[in-house]
């Protein structure tokens, strides 16, 4: 099917727009880490991330992203290379994602529920040499690593981002 015949070309949803609503908007082309920088400068003490009652401000988030980006660079990750992230939706996942983008690398987000076979394929297909994951998955990733291109595993803990007394669990 030619693009001109596709529903995306015809845009039938535009008929449902209220009068005065534009069919397209102008937007600034800006990278996500640059948006973070801008937001951290404008609202440094506002909450950027909240996880299970633990809050991180934009200033703190920017600092964490910058420090982890430096860590990835120290590991030898270069622009265009892949970094595998195997984390649930939690603060370290966001930090790893932004840090990877900060250095111009490619994020390879993986589902913690993937089987070892699926993860092996994801890591090898992407060429990821660095993996960011939970300490709870440590033994599993150590066993999987020899079958992949992963050279460095970075562990994070859910407990590091929980308020007291949950952080003791």
Name what the model sees in each region.
Residues 1, 75, 102-169:
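Structural core segment of the AMP-binding/adenylate-forming
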Residues 1-29:
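Flexible, non-catalytic linker and terminal segments flanking ANL/adenylate-forming cores
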Residues 2, 40-45:
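A short, compositionally biased
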Residues 2-9, 85-88, 107-113:
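Short low-complexity stretches enriched in small and charged residues
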Residues 13, 28, 38, 101, ...:
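Ligand-binding pocket scaffold of soluble enzyme catalytic domains
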Residues 26-28, 33, 37, 45-90, ...:
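Conserved AMP-binding/adenylate-forming core of the ANL superfamily
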Residues 41-42, 63, 102, 109:
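Charged/polar positions on well-ordered alpha helices
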């Amino acid at each position: 099917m030619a693009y001109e015949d596709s529903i995306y070309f015809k845009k039938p949803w535009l008929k449902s727009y209220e009068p005065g609503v534009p069919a397209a908007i102008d937007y600034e082309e800006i990278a996500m880490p640059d948006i973070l920088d801008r937001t951290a400068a404008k609202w440094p003490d506002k909450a950027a991330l909240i996880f299970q009652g633990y809050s991180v401000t934009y200033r703190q988030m920017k600092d964490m992203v910058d420090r982890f980006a430096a860590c990835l660079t120290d590991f030898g990750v270069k622009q265009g290379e892949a970094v595998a992230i195997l984390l649930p939706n939690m603060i370290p996942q966001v930090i790893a994602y932004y840090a990877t983008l900060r250095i111009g690398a490619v994020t390879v987000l993986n589902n913690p529920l993937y089987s070892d076979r699926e993860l092996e394929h994801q890591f090898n297909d992407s060429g990821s040499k660095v993996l960011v994951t939970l300490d709870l998955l440590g033994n599993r990733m150590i066993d999987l690593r020899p079958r992949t291109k992963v050279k460095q595993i970075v562990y994070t803990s859910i407990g590091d981002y929980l308020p007291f007394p949950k952080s003791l669990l």
